[in-house]
């Protein structure tokens, strides 16, 4: 099975268009003010307009404020929601959209128990985590600690063209999620780095 690729933290329409042209399966928009990759609704609409049919648009939230998700869902017609904070299962399912729950790795929590707590999630994104911090850290973690049999298994955290082929070979995930690993600076995607990343994912699939 081919590993899907999500390019997350897109802040410019031209970066979304380049990612799609090069073969990305999904584009991620960050709705978290603390992130250097955060976008407002005006910016998000321009990015979504650059994404053609059959490429997913994912909205990433970290402990969203009341009404924040509804505004994004209604205004952007997001395909999937991604929750990266301490959101309860009831909140995640409330919006009646497919959702992916981030699983914090390295913070002491049991990932199997974490997955079991979200039985209606469409997928789980395993990312590095430090106690007391919110969201991902852009760092790798021990992939041997990922439990087996996880639906929609997505690996994130410290991925780049230099290591993603090995991660794909070792984990055989449904998808990989990359942000800083394809950037020239925070929030600015680099076309050449995206192309190399996608090529390395394909190489990992073939070996």
Swiss-Prot record:
It is an enzyme of class 5 (isomerase). Transmembrane segments: none annotated. One of its GO terms (molecular function) is phosphoribosylanthranilate isomerase activity. Pathway: Amino-acid biosynthesis; L-tryptophan biosynthesis; L-tryptophan from chorismate: step 3/5. Gene3D superfamilies: Aldolase class I (3.20.20.70). InterPro entries: Aldolase_TIM (IPR013785), PRAI_dom (IPR001240), RibuloseP-bd_barrel (IPR011060), TrpF_fam (IPR044643). Keywords: Amino-acid biosynthesis, Aromatic amino acid biosynthesis, Isomerase, Tryptophan biosynthesis. Pfam families: PRAI. Its EC number is 5.3.1.24. GO terms for biological process: L-tryptophan biosynthetic process. It catalyses: N-(5-phospho-beta-D-ribosyl)anthranilate = 1-(2-carboxyphenylamino)-1-deoxy-D-ribulose 5-phosphate. HAMAP family: PRAI. This is N-(5'-phosphoribosyl)anthranilate isomerase. It comes from Halorhodospira halophila (strain DSM 244 / SL1) (Ectothiorhodospira halophila (strain DSM 244 / SL1)).
